[in-house]
Curated annotation (Swiss-Prot):
Responsible for synthesis of pseudouridine from uracil-516 in 16S ribosomal RNA. It comes from Escherichia coli (strain K12). This is Ribosomal small subunit pseudouridine synthase A. It catalyses: uridine(516) in 16S rRNA = pseudouridine(516) in 16S rRNA. It comes from the Bacteria. The gene is rsuA.
Amino acid sequence: MRLDKFIAQQLGVSRAIAGREIRGNRVTVDGEIVRNAAFKLLPEHDVAYDGNPLAQQHGPRYFMLNKPQGYVCSTDDPDHPTVLYFLDEPVAWKLHAAGRLDIDTTGLVLMTDDGQWSHRITSPRHHCEKTYLVTLESPVADDTAEQFAKGVQLHNEKDLTKPAVLEVITPTQVRLTISEGRYHQVKRMFAAVGNHVVELHRERIGGITLDADLAPGEYRPLTEEEIASVV
């Protein structure tokens, strides 16, 4: 990779600005100042900007994050903090959420810079299952599981929801597995049967389950098995 392209990616600036910084003697390779923007970087090179090391990125990246409340899954929001706050990774701004959560919803968020991989999670034709732990305002009705298994009519929607699986844990806490990703779907499904979601926590996406060792705001790389489970 050319040095100016690498610096542009790392700093989030244009190639022209990156070239200016290089010519300004602010970039070193293996401890030596390099002023040639076209310098060919090799994987073993150590690059620094103003003395701060810059890590070269090799291949796509995949992480799971335990999202706390109060953060949005977009990578740039003028009004709210984003989940990128938690990711201490080079050029973290290149990562995106493979399946977003609302600002008040907690739990599993998958972050990647592999667009094809995330498409297999978010595309409706792949029917990727997601499991949520749901806390309800009122005790769940006896026939809710049956209604969800058949599909319910959401407000302002033409088609019924696809069959969903409801597991009752306590009268006001349930586990719901769905295979589509309509707008605010879980909250709207319970509204359709006369209940209200108080808390919502995503536990699973496809074959990837939130690591119980991750506290809110913590993240880790996905394992090879977890990455390969998204097909």
